[in-house]
């Protein structure tokens, strides 16, 4: 498993705690709840993602609502919301990462923590977001 994947997994678990339980983000980002070894690179990447989502949550949630087609945000599972949030953040803030890689990573996380059906939903939403919000702004 790559350090980016582990960092994303950590970020997902952290965002889940923040969203579901209301854990303070700074407390969650200490990762003292995680019982496996974490490299500095994994932790730094997870913190980057979590901070980015926390700081941009309102705007990201607006985008999720826009592209979720007739789904209220509250109807989307906490795990799926968190995956969408961190993936949209990556698509917006990490232009050096190829969009298909970010979307594939989101799909893999969804398969790991949710269902195949959820993975299709995540893939479709992120693909639509990318094609309408990111791709037109990329230099050609």
From Swiss-Prot:
List, alphabetically, the GO terms of the cellular component aspect. Answer: cytosol
Among InterPro entries, the record links this protein to: NusB-like_sf, NusB_fam, NusB_RsmB_TIM44
Report whether ATP-binding shows up as a keyword of the record.
no
Source species, domain of life: Bacteria
Which keywords does this chain's UniProt record carry?
RNA-binding, Transcription, Transcription antitermination, Transcription regulation
| GO term, biological process aspect, one | DNA-templated transcription termination
- UniProt family annotation: Belongs to the NusB family.
Return the PANTHER family for the record.
Answer: ANTITERMINATION NUSB DOMAIN-CONTAINING PROTEIN, N UTILIZATION SUBSTANCE PROTEIN B-RELATED
Q: What does this protein do?
A: Involved in transcription antitermination. Required for transcription of ribosomal RNA (rRNA) genes. Binds specifically to the boxA antiterminator sequence of the ribosomal RNA (rrn) operons.
Which NCBIfam families does this chain map to? Answer: nusB
Its protein name is Transcription antitermination protein NusB
